Amino acid sequence: MNIHEYQAKALLKSYGAPVAEGVAIFSADEAAAAAKKLPGPLYVVKSQIHAGGRGKGKFKELGADAKGGVRLAKSADEVVAHAREMLGNTLVTKQTGPSGKQVNRLYIEDGADIDRELYLSILVDRSVGQVAFVVSTEGGMDIEAVAEHTPEKIVTVAIDPDKGVTADDLKTLTEALKLDGEARADAEKLFPILYKAFVEKDMSLLEVNPLIVMTNGRMRVLDAKVSFDGNALFRHEDVVALRDTTEEDEKEIEASKYDLAYVALDGNIGCMVNGAGLAMATMDIIKLYGAEPANFLDVGGGASKEKVTQAFKIITADPAVKGILVNIFGGIMKCDVIAEGVIAAVKEVGLKVPLVVRLEGTNVELGKKIINESGLNVISADDLDDAAQKIVAAVKGA
C-alpha cells in the first residue's frame, strides 16, 4: 500500500525526522491560508499523486510550456495561482503512463536553501535476507540511471536485525555520502530513526530522494516515498486510515475483494493465469509474439468457480482489452473449475473479444469437455506457445 508524500513526512516527523513545515490542501481556496501558516518567503507547491517524476511531469490540459507537478512560488499569491492551475488537472509522468493521474490534493511546503542533494532508501535486500540502506551522493535524480551509468556511486549497507543500525553502519553510510560536521551528526541521528520507522510500520520501501544538506549545514528530508507490506496492514489501523483509493486502479480494488492478485498494465490482451510464475511467463510470451498484456492476474491455487467468474468479469471490464488468454496448469487448481467459472462469466457479461483457453493438468479432459459443450466461441490451445500465437493473431486480425 502506498501513501502520499505529505502523509509519509508526517509519519517520519512523528519519529523525529527533520522535515519542512507544510500544509496539505484539497482546493485552491485553501492555498492562501496554507501559505500564511508557513515561514516563507519561498514555497514549494507539490502535486500529491502516487507516482514519481512529478517535477518533470506535464499536465494534459495545459500547454507544452506549462510548468510541471512541483513548482516554486515566491509569494502567497503565486501559491494560489499554481494551485488553481494544478488542482483538478491530469499530471502525466514517466511512472503514470500516458493516461496520467488527476491531481486532487497539493502539499504546500516551506522552501529550503539546498547545498547538496543525496539519495537514501531502505528496503528488503532479498539477496542477503536483511533490511538494507541504499545510499548515493547522486540525489535528486533517477536512481535507476545512476545504477546504470555510475553504479560505483551507490552503496548498500545491510542491517543486522539483532543489532539494528550500529556505529559501524553509520560510519559506512556517512562516509559513502561524504558527510561531515553538523550534517554528519544529523545523519547519525536520522538513519536509526528511519530504520525504526521502517521496521515498526512494516514498510516495504522508504525512499528519501532527495535527502538534502542545506546551506546552513543541516540535513532535511525533502521528499519521501513510503510503501507498506499489504500482508501486515492488519497490524496498523493508523496506516490503513491513510489509504487513498482514488489513487488506485478500480479493477485492482475490485480484485482485492476476492483475494485476486491483479495488476493493470497498458496492453490489450487480458490474461487469467494460476500462479505468479506462470502469469509472468504468459506475459513474457505475449510480448515475444509482438503484443502487450493488459494485466497480470493470478487466480491462485484454490480458486472457486465464483472467484474465477469475478476474475473474468474484471478482465472484460477493461475497455482496452481486445482479446483474452486463459492459461491454466491445474494442480490444486482444477481445470473443470476454471472452465465452469469462465463459462458462467461469459454467460453473464457476454463475449465480445477473442478468447483463447489453454488447459493442462488436473481434470483437464473434463475442463475441455465443459468448454467444448458450452457452445461458446472459444479458441483452444495445446500449449503456452500455441496459446500466445493464437491470441496475438486473433487480436491483430480482429
Curated annotation (Swiss-Prot):
Task: State the needed cofactors, names only.
Answer: Mg(2+)
Q: Which reaction does it catalyse?
A: succinate + ATP + CoA = succinyl-CoA + ADP + phosphate; GTP + succinate + CoA = succinyl-CoA + GDP + phosphate
Instruction: Identify the NCBIfam families for this entry.
Output: PRK00696.1, sucCoAbeta
Q: Which SUPFAM superfamilies match?
A: Glutathione synthetase ATP-binding domain-like, Succinyl-CoA synthetase domains
Q: What is this protein called?
A: Succinate--CoA ligase [ADP-forming] subunit beta
User: What InterPro entries does the record point to?
Assistant: ATP-grasp, ATP-grasp_succ-CoA_synth-type, ATP_grasp_subdomain_1, Succ-CoA_synthase_bsu_CS, SUCC_ACL_C, Succ_CoA_ligase-like_bsu, Succinyl-CoA_synth-like
Gene Ontology MF: a single term: ATP binding
Kindly indicate whether the keyword Nucleotide-binding belongs to this entry: yes
Residue span, ATP-grasp domain: 9-254
Q: How is the cofactor bound?
A: Binds 1 Mg(2+) ion per subunit.
